[in-house]
């Protein structure tokens, strides 16, 4: 038996080193090398090689026939949109997200839909027993005979079962709990994650079985394990949201078969995850029309316009240093906006505590929402109500000018569906609008001062 030895792997790029170093010599990242004890290398039952087999031969590109097999629909329109029309046969997909955000719930519901409409699905869990999976399935009202579950962490055994079943979809929950006996290291280590992912990649490509693997995330929000993991897979998805709120967003970070600009929006309810085809209506359902400090903004989630209410509260500070608090909005942008309002508009905010909140637990970082945020702040400061059928859009510069924003007509069309009639937009965008709809009123502004006069006149 080979003597055990200690090696160090970079969690970012997977580089192997015989000694610890503060900085990875390959990728240059700091404090990414972790120690692993290698007791000896066993003879691998499955050679570690690339996709395909040793008999593969090169083929001219025009001679390659495109398979007639269509994408597999999950029957969730929100998920199919993010994936570019459905699951591509033979694709290896990675789903990441914070603990408890709903990753397993989402994939269990997808497994049920695929099992009912396409064929057998194998759900392999290394985190829950079969009894625990059954209890979760009952809560979600899932009871498909074609959905088979296995509670195991031995990837080789799971792949043997998948070979026998030939499922239409394979789910691995999660890659950090899986191990192969050919690598003498703990599950979740860099070498185990890399080798297990490599074997899953070969399996799904050679047998044309789409596979989804769940990945844990670090406290920085990155997928745990080597960065190579994200490079190996075909699709990288992130499931985001605040656990204390019901809304969840499925975002594509990498997609070899479609766009990365699409997003899917869900609501977490008692029966599981429910897709929201019209999230703007849900976000504005409880908006009050009798209170100051409220405005409606339209931000782009990928290429999808979403209307959301923003609220502000401005009170006289009880301390020497005024507080600025932002929930769902960038604090630095808020501080800049307050400085612009004080310098360019003459509002006294140096002795005021300012609190802003984006309703629904969503996070908005788009500059196009600057003007609506500024209007909400002034609304509460002056105790003036913003018209309920008005939407304000525009990026605010340090000089107080209102700059153009992208996809203005797409945003306006989305707001029209919900009954909004008045729009204040940048002058540069106003000149670009081609649709002269007489049922709505659009005004273009050049400065933040002009916008305030239009809203509160």
Task: Please report, for each region that a protein language model flagged, where it lies by residue.
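Conserved RecA-like ASCE P-loop NTPase motor core of nucleic-acid helicases/translocases
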Residues: 121-125
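Peripheral, non-AAA+ core regions of ATP-driven protein-machinery
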Residues: 2-12, 16-81, 88-94, 101-112, ...
């Amino acid at each position: 038996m080979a003597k055990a030895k200690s090696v160090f792997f970079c969690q970012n790029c997977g580089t192997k080193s015989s000694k610890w170093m503060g900085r990875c010599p390959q990728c240059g990242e700091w404090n990414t090398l972790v120690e692993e004890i290698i007791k000896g290398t066993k003879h691998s039952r499955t050679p570690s090689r690339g996709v395909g087999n040793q008999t593969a031969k090169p083929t001219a590109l025009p001679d390659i026939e495109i398979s007639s097999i269509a994408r597999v629909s999950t029957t969730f329109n929100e998920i199919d949109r993010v994936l570019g029309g459905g699951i591509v046969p033979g694709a290896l997909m990675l789903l990441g997200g914070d603990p408890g955000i709903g990753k397993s719930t989402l994939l269990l519901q997808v497994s049920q839909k695929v099992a009912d409409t396409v064929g057998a699905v194998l759900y392999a869990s290394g985190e829950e027993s079969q009894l625990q999976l059954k209890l979760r399935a009952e809560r979600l009202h899932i009871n498909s005979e074609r959905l088979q579950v296995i509670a195991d962490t031995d990837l080789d055994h799971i792949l043997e079962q998948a070979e026998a079943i030939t499922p239409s979809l394979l789910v691995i929950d999660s890659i950090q709990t899986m191990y192969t006996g050919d690598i003498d290291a703990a599950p979740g280590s860099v070498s185990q994650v890399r080798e297990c992912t490599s074997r899953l990649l070969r399996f799904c490509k050679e047998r044309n079985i789409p596979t989804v693997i769940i990945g844990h995330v670090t406290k920085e929000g990155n997928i745990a394990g080597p960065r190579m993991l994200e490079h190996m897979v075909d699709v990288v998805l992130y499931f985001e949201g605040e656990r204390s709120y019901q809304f969840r967003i499925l975002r594509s970070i990498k997609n070899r078969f479609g766009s990365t600009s699409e997003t899917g929006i869900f609501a977490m309810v008692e029966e599981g995850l429910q897709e929201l085809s019209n999230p703007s209506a849900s976000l504005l359902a409880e908006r009050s029309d009798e209170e100051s400090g409220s405005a409606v903004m339209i931000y782009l989630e990928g290429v999808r316009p979403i209307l959301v209410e923003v609220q502000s509260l401005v009170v006289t500070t009880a301390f020497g240093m005024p507080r600025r608090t932002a929930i769902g909005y960038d604090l630095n942008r808020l501080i800049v906006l307050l400085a612009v309002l004080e310098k360019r508009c003459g509002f006294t905010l140096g002795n005021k505590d300012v609190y802003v909140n984006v309703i629904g637990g969503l996070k908005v970082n788009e500059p196009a929402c600057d003007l609506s945020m500024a209007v909400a702040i002034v609304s509460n400061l002056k105790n003036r109500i913003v018209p309920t059928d008005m939407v304000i859009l525009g990026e605010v510069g340090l000089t107080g000018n209102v700059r153009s924003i992208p996809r203005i007509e797409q945003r306006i069309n989305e707001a029209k569906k919900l009954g909004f009639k008045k729009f204040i937009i940048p002058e540069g965008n106003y000149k670009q609008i081609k649709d002269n709809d007489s049922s709505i009123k659009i005004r273009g502004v050049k400065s933040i001062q002009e916008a305030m006069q239009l809203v509160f006149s």
